[in-house]
Structures are given as C-alpha cells and as structure tokens.
Amino acid sequence: MVKVKICGITNLEDALFCAKEGADYIGVITYPKSPRYTSKEKRLEIIKALEGLNVKKVAVVVNEPYEFIKELLDEGFDLIQLHGDEDIELGKRVGLDKVIKVFRVKEEIPKVGEWEKAYAILLDTFSKEAYGGTGKTFNWEIAKKLVEEGHKVFLSGGLNPENVKEGIEFVKPYGVDVSSGVEKEKGKKDFKKVREFIKRTKSE
C-alpha cells in the first residue's frame, strides 16, 4: 500500500488528526524562511504528542549543519528530510538510513545515484522562490522512470485529493507527500481534504 506523508505540520491538532486518520509520516519544517516554520518549542510538543502512535516523524531541513541535524534526531525525529543543496558527505554523517533526500525537478531526470542507499528520495517541483510547498506538479514521467529503475520514491509537488490517485496509478511510487494540497491556509490543514487525500491514496 502506498504510504502517505503529510508535510508542513505546525500545530498539535493537525499532527494528531493526520496520525489518527492514517498518515504514515508527519513532516515538520525547521527552515525559518518557510511560512510553515515550526519553532523548537512547538516541535517538541508535536513529537511528545505523537509518541506511541504508528507514525514516523520527519524533520525538514534546508542547508543546515550536522550539529543542528543531530539535535533534531536527539529531540525524537525518526528521519531527516534534506531539502536543500546538501552533499552526500553530510548524508553519510547523519546516516543514510535516516535520510530522505529531496530533488527539485526541472525538465531532466535528477542524478540520484549516490543517494541510492538513503531511506528514500523525494521528488518535488523546482521553484526559484521556495523550497517546497509550491502547489505545482512536475512531469511525472521523470518520477515514473526513477521508480522503474528501482528507487524508493516519494512523489511530491502539487498533489491534492483530486489528482493523487492519478499520480499513484501513473508513477507507482513508494509514497506520496502533500502540504499545500490539504491546507485551508498556510500552516493549517483542512481536515476534510486530509481525510480525502489519505482515503484516495490508501484505496490504491
């Protein structure tokens, strides 16, 4: 069954709702320039509330040093999503089995080879303005090709309850990742959309 990652969680209520509805991964953003940025205090609150629930906690970082990433793992995050221009050496230092490496897709197939031992790769839509949360899709042929090559892929970028089923059928990813596609406003999830997104993904 295809896994669901709900990203851009900023508050306790959203985190618990997503986990109880069947999300497999909850993503919390530590990048201060993101409109979905979550402070350390709030992060710790979310992690504590999710203890004992069958959901993996993912910290999303953009070009942060190893020391900060280690702090996040010590806080209780299961996985680190490297969403910037991080190199493989940082990935190895963190432990590739704990890393989801993001590739922001333009027109060509990204070179993912050296990250093949990572927990997974996540394909998102390239934008000059933002690291993720763009609400725009990219050419799914690229994602499909990487899946066919045997990579463990999270499909992201512009997914919502209306198109997620089509994306899954075409790409056949390991998982799907959504943020803005299930929001009522930046940083606040729309519970109806979350429920519908998970339902349509899990019906595959």
From Swiss-Prot:
One GO MF term: phosphoribosylanthranilate isomerase activity
Cystines in this chain: none
Enzyme class per UniProt: isomerase
UniProt keyword Amino-acid biosynthesis present: yes
Annotated transmembrane regions: none
InterPro entries: Aldolase_TIM, PRAI_dom, RibuloseP-bd_barrel, TrpF_fam
Keyword Transcription regulation assigned: no
Sorted UniProt keywords: Amino-acid biosynthesis, Aromatic amino acid biosynthesis, Isomerase, Tryptophan biosynthesis
A family per Pfam: PRAI
Pathway(s): Amino-acid biosynthesis; L-tryptophan biosynthesis; L-tryptophan from chorismate: step 3/5
Assigned EC number: 5.3.1.24
GO process terms (BP): L-tryptophan biosynthetic process
Family: Belongs to the TrpF family.
Name of the protein in question: N-(5'-phosphoribosyl)anthranilate isomerase
Underlying gene: trpF
